[in-house]
Amino acid sequence: MTTPADDFTQPETPAITLPAFLELMNNDLQNEWTHLKFYLYHASAITGLDVAEYREFFSDAAKGEMDHVQQFLDRLYGLNYANPTQTSHSFSVFSRADDALTHAIELEMVVAENYVKRLQQLEQLAGAHPVTARYLTVFYEDQLKDSYEDAERMRRIMANDLREIMRNTRHDPTKFLAK
């Protein structure tokens, strides 16, 4: 005899496969290409009194993203993924530093959230591929740390501007806060 509680049990979520995870990882690589191009573009596009400082900031950020792209490529090739992406998503362009930084914070927080999902998916992958899953867990923890800290650094750069933006806002303030 079944009880009413039996009718409400959730079906088990099937564990993710390694090929499916590598597809998601390739999508993450595309996001990293987007960040690289965004920062490199804005190193030259920003105008204003502090242009030299922002050029240096965005150039350094682009170098960091280039490292991320290389790390994702190395992992994908190391796991025999046949054709890692060479493309990025399109991105918004800005001439004002505060607009570019605001958007960059959003970009970094989106990937940070994706990396949290990947870490959860790697828990599912661990049963079938324990060593690979553990290695990729360390990899994604490092990526999460970098993206979160990049967003945090930009929030600090913009501390006063960000408060004003959020007050008058055309931006959703929750995009700037850690979840």
Predicted region positions:
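Iron-associated oxidoreductase/ferritin-like identity signal
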Residues: M1-K179
